[in-house]
Amino acid sequence: MANNKSALKRAQIAERNRVRNKTYKSSVKTLMKNYLSAVQAYAANPTPESKQEAQTRLAAAYSRIDKAVKRGILHPNNGARKKSRLASKLKPIEQTA
């Protein structure tokens, strides 16, 4: 464990940041899952309402991913990759519907 006050403080700060980052990453994953379920609902029943719901959830997921990147929780390339994968889920369904 830490041998002096500054090392102890850094350990406490690291733990605080770890918990904060974990909750933020968890919320990103939750919003991504919500979006994917909305896309599946739209694929099963392509209505304008379900498409709007999917687009709304996509915007929410994009927003949370961008904020995580801005705060340094996710690497910029990781955020871009997540956003790209989310967009690629809806695009083929929109073209066929």
Curated annotation (Swiss-Prot):
- Name of the protein in question: Small ribosomal subunit protein bS20
- Classification lineage: Bacteria, Bacillati, Cyanobacteriota, Cyanophyceae, Nostocales
The record's family statement is:
Belongs to the bacterial ribosomal protein bS20 family.
Q: Which InterPro entries match?
A: Ribosomal_bS20, Ribosomal_bS20_sf
Short name of one Pfam family: Ribosomal_S20p
Keyword match DNA-binding:
no
Task: Please name the source species.
Answer: Nostoc sp. (strain PCC 7120 / SAG 25.82 / UTEX 2576)
Gene3D superfamilies registered for this protein in UniProt: Ribosomal protein S20 (1.20.58.110)
Per the entry, what this protein does is: Binds directly to 16S ribosomal RNA.
Question: Which is one GO molecular function term here?
Answer: structural constituent of ribosome
GO cellular component terms attached to this protein's record? cytosol; small ribosomal subunit
Q: Where is this region: Disordered?
A: 1-20, 75-97
Key words of the record: Ribonucleoprotein, Ribosomal protein, RNA-binding, rRNA-binding
**Biological processes, Gene Ontology terms:** translation
